[in-house]
């Protein structure tokens, strides 16, 4: 009986996921497909980017500085991109994003020194900002509030399926190319370049401009600055939410440039262990992403955020105090709950303003997130050098517990709320 139950359960899950996608608008399917392809391509190199950059001559401070440059560029373009999207539509900017991703991957592939990584980082940062704003607008238009958290986590879970084998494929290709070295990693960026080219063609052919209503009114509004003043006028909740959203991204902004490098340099992980760690994170997301999304859609986003915080705190603690490969893999698995929690925050964010203001709202959030995220990687590099590598992963936990979670308790649940702006 057990042998029958397992396959039946998988089939039932697939049927529910398919039914969920079909009842959303077409663009949601396009967004899922693009996300899955981009996730696979990104996961080919995600665990090696910092190692590759250090191999080109960077140290911990330069590694952090490059991360800060990425966040600064994302912040600079965030607000104008959001404003332009609201006025002129999303498709042209989404297509531009995929072109910039391809260009960024190519610069990585051709890089003879770490300075080239700055140029690649700039291209990829602008691309990520463009796709982030685009996803917000598409999700706001294509998905109902009661499906929001499920839609966010289903999108990521499907992307996880597509990227599940990427780390192990990458490890095999690196071995064929000469091992865990700069030249062994380099071919992966060429593969990303070609892959993004195909995704670009898909987006051009399949994406439709969202129907966001009141477009003429948005275009006729006063001015760039005036539009943003109007967005926040008298909206105490939105102002407070901006702080929560900015603090949500702080731990990852500070630790992400160093996580894989720490496992490699301090804990002695090789390319296969790094690949297994990434695969473990993907499997955890597949197992828990959709159920937690459904739970958040039933009981509220805030409760699930509180539930998940201790799990990703444990991930950083296990990474720091790990003594063997098993605890490194467990750490990577638990780190997934940070991404799930961030998805809950994103779901709440989309429920605070109407669709026709979503571009400006995403742009404003990007600006304020950036003001927090810009210095975070550079500070992480200084902490690595001056205090020691482990403190890069411990200090953000204290900040998150004391500031973000405390402030979140003062905000209302958005599950059944009407947009406030």
PLM regions and their residue ranges:
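Helix-loop boundary and gating motifs at the non-cytosolic
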Residues: 13-75, 237-278
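Helix-loop junctions on the cytosolic side of multi-pass membrane transporters
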Residues: 202-218, 408-420
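Juxtamembrane intracellular "pre-TM" segments in multi-pass secondary transporters
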Residues: 2-28, 209-243, 421
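Symmetry-related core transmembrane helices of the 12-TM Major Facilitator Superfamily/SLC fold
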Residues: 186-204, 391-408
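Structural signature of the two symmetry-related core transmembrane helices
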Residues: 92-107, 193, 303-318, 397
């Amino acid at each position: 009986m057990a042998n029958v139950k397992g396959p039946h359960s998988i089939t039932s899950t697939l049927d529910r996921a398919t039914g969920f996608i079909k009842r959303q608008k077409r663009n949601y399917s396009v967004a899922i497909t693009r996300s899955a392809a981009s996730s696979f391509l990104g996961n080919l190199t995600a665990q090696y980017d910092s190692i590759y950059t250090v191999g080109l001559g960077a140290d911990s401070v330069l590694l952090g500085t490059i991360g800060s440059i990425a966040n600064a560029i994302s912040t600079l373009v965030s607000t104008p991109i959001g404003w332009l999207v609201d006025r002129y539509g999303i498709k042209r900017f989404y297509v531009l994003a995929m072109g910039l991703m391809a260009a960024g991957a190519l610069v990585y592939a051709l890089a003879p020194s770490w300075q080239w990584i700055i140029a690649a980082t700039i291209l990829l940062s602008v691309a990520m900002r463009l796709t982030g704003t685009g996803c917000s607008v598409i999700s706001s238009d294509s998905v109902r509030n009661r499906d929001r958290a499920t839609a966010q986590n289903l999108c990521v879970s499907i992307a996880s399926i597509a990227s599940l084998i990427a780390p192990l494929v990458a490890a095999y290709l690196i071995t064929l190319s000469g091992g865990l070295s700069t030249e062994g990693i380099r071919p992966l960026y060429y593969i990303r370049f070609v892959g993004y080219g195909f995704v670009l063609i898909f987006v051009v052919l399949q994406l439709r401009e969202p129907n966001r209503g009141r477009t003429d009114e948005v275009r006729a509004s006063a001015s760039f600055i005036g539009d943003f003043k109007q967005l926040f006028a008298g909206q105490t909740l939105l102002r407070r939410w901006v702080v929560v959203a900015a603090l949500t991204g702080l731990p990852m902004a500070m630790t992400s440039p160093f996580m894989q490098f720490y496992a490699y340099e301090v804990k002695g992980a090789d390319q296969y262990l790094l690949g297994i760690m990434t695969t473990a994170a993907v499997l955890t997301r597949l197992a828990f992403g959709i159920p937690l999304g459904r739970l958040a859609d039933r009981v509220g986003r805030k409760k699930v955020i509180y539930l998940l915080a201790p799990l990703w705190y444990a991930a950083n603690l296990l990474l720091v105090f790990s003594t063997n490969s098993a605890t490194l893999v467990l750490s990577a698995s638990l780190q997934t709950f940070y991404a799930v929690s961030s998805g809950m925050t994103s779901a709440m964010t989309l429920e605070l303003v109407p669709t026709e203001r979503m571009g400006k709202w995403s742009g404003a959030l990007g600006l304020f997130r950036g003001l927090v995220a810009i210095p975070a990687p550079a500070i992480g590099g200084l902490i690595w050098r001056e205090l020691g590598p482990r403190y890069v992963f411990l200090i953000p936990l204290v900040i998150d517990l004391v500031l973000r979670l405390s402030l979140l308790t003062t905000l209302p649940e958005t599950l059944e709320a009407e947009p406030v702006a």
